[in-house]
Amino acid sequence: MKKNNFGFTLIELLAVVLMIGILTSVALPQYRRSVQRAEAMEALVNLKTIFDSAKRYRAANSDTPGSLKGLDVQFFDADPNSSDPIIGNFRYAIKPTHIGACRVDGKAHSTYTDTYCLVMMYKETINGTTYRDLLKCNTGSEKWKYVCESLAQSCTNGNTAKSGTTYYISDKVVCD
């Protein structure tokens, strides 16, 4: 009488588990980077929204806003009276010369360790040329360098528009 054995051997199961582990180890870092780039894009959209609203505020009041209060935008998770509200994973700074968004380590601590910042300048002079509404990304951390590089403008010569640790996102910056 012939005996039929159905099922998998231990070796076959171990091989499948090993393959799943290898695929996960390759895919997980890419997934994490995609999530971080998406967070940066969300901050970029929020930053541009606040910046445009601040420009309208300046035009109407001949002054720069000191907080979100008085602007024609609202963020449900932000304190409108704060000059540096936290929205999502970013702390926004509303200053007379610029509006910035720095990635913070968490709402509880809100520290600026090992991070990057997106900055919208009302006006900045670079190499004798004055630019208005200049958008840039600053990082001193190798860990976050790829975020700034992925957001930065590409020059016609294939280089990234940057100066030191500052990456220019605005298409107004002339590439070297």
Name each model feature, range by range.
Residues 1-3, 18, 40, 44, ...:
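Short, contiguous, well-ordered secondary-structure segments
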Residues 2-30, 34-35, 43-46:
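N-terminal single-pass transmembrane signal-anchor helix
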Residues 6-8, 51, 75-76, 90:
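Phenylalanine-focused residue identity feature
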Residues 25, 33-73:
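Conserved hydrophobic/amphipathic alpha-helical signal-anchor segments
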Residues 60-176:
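Periplasmic/extracellular, small/polar-rich flexible segments of pilin-like filament-forming proteins
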